[in-house]
Amino acid sequence: MNNMKTFKFFTALFATAILTACTLDMERPTNVQYIDKTDAIWQQHLQKIQKIQSYQAKGQIGYISPTERFSSRFEWQYQNPKSYTLKLYSLISKSTLWIQMHQSGMTISDNNGNQQSAANSKLLLQEIIGMDVPLEHLAYWLKGQPAMNADYQVGTNHLLGAFTYHVDGSQWTADYLTYHSNNSMPENILLKNDSTKQTLKIRVDEWIY
């Protein structure tokens, strides 16, 4: 891409265009009851989602940080840690961003033909979009699979209720608010990082795996 300023200007317009009037509930739920992690139904479900290696998810995402605030439709396609795509788009403005992970790093592009690539995906996300979200971990968080070293809780629905996970010196928390009744996959997820003051609220409307 020849003009970084043009790309940044576009992403600013994109964020403005997809802002919605609804507000994100930034507070974690309270008085939630949990059950033991050895619960047989949960262990069976955990084995099921661990076998899901590649999948697609579609829905809506809302993001709040001290410098950015936007809401967007999204399409997530995941194959492996070195091959995934996150598409952010607006049904109103037709603005679209593609975030693509590949063997040599990450590429972010838009529907105007702007494109930027870098080997360091974390820095590229921060520079272009202003997000500091570990997408490599989001692949597991999205489907409700806690990391092996994560401190997590199981809800009374026998599914993942919440977890705490440390990434790059800061702590992320996740609360799984609702699940789809037909496949027991997450529907509404609240992700927060209090140290970086980031909130990510995700609603998954469709799962394909």
Swiss-Prot record:
Gene Ontology CC annotations of this record: cell outer membrane
Coiled coil regions in record: none
Localization of this protein: Cell outer membrane
Main location: membrane
Lipidation (S-diacylglycerol cysteine): C22
Keyword match Transcription regulation: no
Subunit structure: Monomer.
Name of the protein described by the UniProt record: Outer-membrane lipoprotein LolB
